[in-house]
Amino acid sequence: MNDFVFSDIPDNVKPMASVEFDDPLTIATGDVLNWTLWLTRNFPALSSIIMRLPSSLVSMVTSSFEGANQMVQVKTSTHNLYSLSLPTHARKQIISQLVEHEKNHIGPKSKDCVMQRLLNAHRDSESKISIPTPDATLRSEAVGFTLAGTADPPNILALGTFMAARDSEMQKGLYKELKAIWPDLRSPAPSYNLLHQLPLLRGIIKESIRFTHGVATGPARLVGAGGARIGGYNVPAKASSFSAAATSDCS
């Protein structure tokens, strides 16, 4: 998901660079996924007020907002996680740092990633936007994509792994494909473009996506006696429906 949103993630926060997956971005993203998502979804005004309060005050009541604070608030600290274009006395929220890194880092950029598309939207001859996308919008989109991408991929990959584990021939074929391009597991993971060329791996992931529904939040509801129309589809009476996490899709 990070590669989909950004062209480049600094090495010190890349999940695959940490054996324990304890980099700041992964920890903060995981900590955000708790009951506060329900609060944000159902009481956005209250959630907004809480996020504007000093984090030290909120932490006296609950620690559930600490992940969100790391992601979307600015804190003062003598520790500077990123040295690139940031003063040593300030540690900006992780998302802001990633957005600044995307804008300022020297190196190849993926024109198709979310951030580059937003940064260059005003340069598109067909675009109705003539000014650069504001940083606040970039941060908002980055947070939305980053958090939304933490729910469904694990669900999809868990199903794919389970199904592949039931077929020994599929396991052998998949292992052979991966071993050919990644002989040493201690070395950095292959690039997305290289993995995308593996036909069996790509097929397993596509089928896993096809068979997996979104992560449900809240209890399922039964459609009333008269049926209902949801998302343009006629749903019969007594059918179970639920809302998928973060996306509000109905299944």
From Swiss-Prot:
The keyword Iron applies. It is an enzyme of class 1 (oxidoreductase). Its EC number is 1.-.-.-. Keywords: Heme, Iron, Metal-binding, Monooxygenase, Oxidoreductase. It comes from the Eukaryota. Its cofactor is heme. InterPro entries: Cyt_P450, Cyt_P450_sf. One of its GO terms (molecular function) is monooxygenase activity. Heme binds at C250. Pathway: Secondary metabolite biosynthesis. Cytochrome P450 monooxygenase; part of the gene cluster that mediates the biosynthesis of pyrrolopyrazines, secondary metabolites showing insecticidal activity. The role of ppzG within the pathway has still to be determined. The single multifunctional NRPS ppzA is sufficient to produce peramine via condensation of 1-pyrroline-5-carboxylate and arginine, N-methylation of the alpha-amino group of arginine and reduction of the thioester and the cyclization to form an iminium ion resulting in release from the peptide synthetase. Belongs to the cytochrome P450 family. This is Cytochrome P450 monooxygenase ppzG. It comes from Metarhizium rileyi (strain RCEF 4871) (Nomuraea rileyi). The lineage of its organism: Eukaryota, Fungi, Dikarya, Ascomycota, Pezizomycotina. The gene is ppzG.
